[in-house]
């Protein structure tokens, strides 16, 4: 799901930069891998990775990749509609809605994704592996699982007021 809308200001945040090496006959070949999260702070967020011999080039590639992989995040006011658990690889992430004014209670990579999505009040817990790429993927996976009350009611074939 790619979005082409340059009118909206998209913010980017570098989550991790890794120095990776490949051992070849002549020695070690050095490159850099970047993990970047982008979002418009208004319900759209994406992440991407890039690899190059120079850090700025790796970041540029990661930003390009992230803009191509943006998702819509359903929100209720300043928080998420319901609690969600997700995992990717060894990383497990728990996201819980929080009351208005609570702020973002999340660490590192999860915080970057949540803030750039525009979610202002949420509590999160990172369980298992703390590898940045897996945490970001688990968080995005969790945000993809979120559904608005209207969607849930439609799936169940009942009205929103009947949801308990």
From Swiss-Prot:
Keyword hit for RNA-binding: yes
Keyword Ribosomal protein set for record: yes
GO biological process, one term: translation
UniProt keyword annotations, A-Z: Ribonucleoprotein, Ribosomal protein, RNA-binding, rRNA-binding
Pfam family of the protein (one): Ribosomal_S5_C
Subunit structure: Part of the 30S ribosomal subunit. Contacts proteins S4 and S8.
Family of this protein: Belongs to the universal ribosomal protein uS5 family.
NCBIfam families in UniProt: rpsE_bact
Name of this chain's protein: Small ribosomal subunit protein uS5
Annotated organism of origin: Streptococcus suis (strain 05ZYH33)
UniProt gene name: rpsE
């Amino acid at each position: 799901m790619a979005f082409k809308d340059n009118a909206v200001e998209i913010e980017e945040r570098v989550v991790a930069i890794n120095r990776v090496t490949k051992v070849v006959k002549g020695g070690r070949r050095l490159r850099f891998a970047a993990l970047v999260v982008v979002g418009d702070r208004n319900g759209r967020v994406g992440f991407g990775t890039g690899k190059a011999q120079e850090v700025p080039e790796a970041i540029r590639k990661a930003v390009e990749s992230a803009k191509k992989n943006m998702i819509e995040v359903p929100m209720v006011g300043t928080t998420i509609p319901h609690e969600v658990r997700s995992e990717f690889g060894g990383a497990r992430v728990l996201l819980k809605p929080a009351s208005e004014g609570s702020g973002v209670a999340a660490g590192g990579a999860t915080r970057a994704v949540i803030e750039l999505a525009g979610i202002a009040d949420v509590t999160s817990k990172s369980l298992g592996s703390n590898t940045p790429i897996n945490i970001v993927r688990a968080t995005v996976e969790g945000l993809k699982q979120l559904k608005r009350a209207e969607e849930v009611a439609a799936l169940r074939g009942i009205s929103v007021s009947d949801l308990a």
